[in-house]
Design a protein with these regions (language model features):
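Active-site acidic/histidine proton-transfer and metal-coordination neighborhood
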Residues: 5, 80-178
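Histidine-acidic metal/acid-base catalytic patches
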Residues: 1-12, 17-35, 105-106, 159-181, ...
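Active-site-proximal loop/turn and secondary-structure-junction residues that shape catalytic pockets
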Residues: 17-19, 45, 69-72, 113-117, ...
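Active-site-adjacent beta->alpha loops and helix N-cap segments on the catalytic face
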Residues: 46-55
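N-terminal small/glycine-rich loop or linker at the start of catalytic domains
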Residues: 2-15, 65-81, 110-115, 149
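A short beta-strand-loop structural module common to alpha/beta enzyme folds
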Residues: 37-46
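Conserved beta-strand positions in the central sheet of alpha/beta enzyme cores
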Residues: 40, 65-67, 110, 145, ...
């Protein structure tokens, strides 16, 4: 029997890293067959939203989040929201993401800040674009997510510290702007994962995990995820945890963690 404070662990397959060799609608089906409770992805825009909606309905999975476009990936861009002079493009991408997310009944849109010079102009640009995104998302019941991303993998990324994200969310004052707390990124930049999760739970809209340092399956590496998940759900988290990792071997060979973690969470 579950203790009163215990929550059932729920896991979302990140299809930006898993089953990437398949069309997105087929990847959703594979995630359901593997035992995931939901899915999330990066940039679904090459496939009509109706096709994704059909796959979600067929599997009974929800789409936890998608990313707004990140600019010119070939040129190394990693988001536009904090780039002065790119506001029109950033907002067009935000509009596109919100419309797509609403069409597939997704939970959230991740607005990526990008690599900035951290100048006052960049800070103001980011704030203005997030306020715009939150206002546009609100009628659809969508959450806008911001994610601190480590600067070892993405040098110069505008937002890299949890507390900076929380401070920004608090200052903006929109109920539908939340933190996407990626344990992999935060462990690299700051550590102290369990305390940061529980201390900032009110501001967290989604959680992601992967092993540190190799970003592989979450059952190895320096973070002991059974303890992290126990602390997270005991603190009252009711959402999904995104499995955003790069398989060390084949996807199927590395999926043993899923059943183990579900069992630990009362499944």
């Amino acid at each position: 029997m579950l203790k009163a404070e215990q929550r059932l662990y729920r896991f979302s397959a990140n299809l930006g890293f898993l089953w990437t060799h398949l069309p997105l609608d087929e990847a959703i089906i594979r995630a359901a067959d593997a035992g995931f409770d939901a899915v999330e992805c990066h940039w679904p825009y090459d496939m009509p939203a109706s096709q994704i909606a059909d796959a979600l309905e067929a599997t009974g999975l929800s789409m936890q989040g998608i990313n707004a476009r990140c600019g010119d990936r070939a040129a190394g861009e990693f988001g536009l929201a904090a780039l002065p002079g790119r506001q029109a493009e950033a907002r067009a991408d935000i509009d596109e993401a919100i419309a797509y997310a609403a069409a597939i009944n997704a939970a959230a849109v991740h607005v990526m800040a990008g690599k900035s010079d951290a100048s006052p102009a960049a800070q103001q640009c980011y704030r203005d674009n997030l306020a715009y995104a939150a206002s546009q998302a609100m009628p659809h019941g969508l959450t806008i997510l911001i994610e601190p991303i480590n600067r070892m993998d993405v040098p110069g990324y505008h937002l890299s510290y949890v507390e900076d994200g929380v401070e920004l969310i608090t200052a903006l004052g929109f109920e539908n702007i939340k933190l996407m707390f990626d344990c992999y990124h935060t462990q690299i930049m700051q550590g102290d994962i369990c305390r940061r999760l529980t201390a900032n739970l009110h501001h967290i809209g989604h959680v992601q995990m992967a092993a540190v340092p190799d970003r592989g399956e979450p059952d190895a590496g320096e973070l002991f995820y059974p303890a992290v998940l126990a602390a997270l759900y005991a603190a009252g988290y009711q959402g999904f945890v995104g499995a955003e990792y790069r398989p060390r071997d084949t996807i199927d060979a590395g999926l043993g963690w899923l059943a183990k973690f579900k069992q630990a969470g009362g499944r």
